[in-house]
């Protein structure tokens, strides 16, 4: 199973660095790691030029957008590029989402262990946990902020 992981980023270079490291540490690494830079102004473009040249068994692809198209626009650009690549699955993620080391392997194991369902499986997703991993976020439309070093999750009002 060849996977292309698409990560959309905007002005969160430190989050992006942490996310990229998490994909390098996967027990089942993606074939492609595709980063969509949503016109960041915090040094992300310069960092990605260097990152793209670093040796890795993962093929690195960077898409630099001329303007910030938001999350949806970034994922659209990433999916378009990913569909041009030789991969079986596309994994999408924000720059502040950090997959567990076996996330991609778990997806592969699930798919491979259910051959009778494979023709009907069009999408799979992981579980979204809060920062402390104490509970599953079912409606993960949340906002977080740090108070004295502790991440506090707060639901975003529906009107937002």
Please name every model-derived segment.
Residues 87-96:
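Short beta-strand-to-loop acidic/aromatic patch adjacent to the donor-nucleotide binding site
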Residues 21-30:
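Short, acidic, metal-binding catalytic loop of nucleotide-sugar glycosyltransferases
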Residues 42-51, 102:
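Acidic helix N-cap motif at the loop->helix transition within catalytic regions
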Residues 102-138:
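Conserved donor NDP-sugar-binding/catalytic core segment of glycosyltransferases
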Residues 2-4, 32:
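Cell-envelope/extracellular polymer assembly enzymes that use nucleotide-activated donors
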Residues 65-82:
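Glycine-rich, basic loop-to-helix element that forms the pyrophosphate-binding segment
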Residues 143-160:
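Short, flexible, basic/aromatic active-site loop/helix in glycosyltransferases
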Residues 37-46, 67, 97:
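A conserved acidic beta->alpha catalytic loop
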């Amino acid at each position: 199973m060849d996977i292309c992981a698409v990560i959309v980023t905007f002005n969160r270079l430190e989050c992006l660095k942490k996310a990229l490291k998490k994909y390098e540490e996967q027990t089942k690494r993606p074939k492609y790691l595709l980063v969509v830079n949503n016109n960041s102004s915090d040094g992300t473009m310069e960092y990605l030029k260097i990152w793209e040249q670093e040796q890795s068994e993962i093929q690195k692809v960077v898409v630099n957008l001329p303007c910030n198209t938001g999350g949806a626009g970034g994922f659209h650009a990433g999916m378009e590029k990913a569909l041009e690549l030789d991969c079986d699955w596309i994994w999408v993620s924000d720059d502040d989402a950090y997959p567990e080391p076996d996330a991609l392997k778990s997806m592969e194991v699930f798919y491979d262990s259910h051959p009778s369902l494979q023709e009907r499986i069009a999408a799979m997703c992981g579980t979204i946990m809060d920062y402390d991993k104490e509970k599953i976020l079912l409606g993960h439309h949340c906002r977080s902020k740090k108070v004295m070093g502790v991440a506090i999750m707060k639901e975003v009002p529906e009107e937002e």
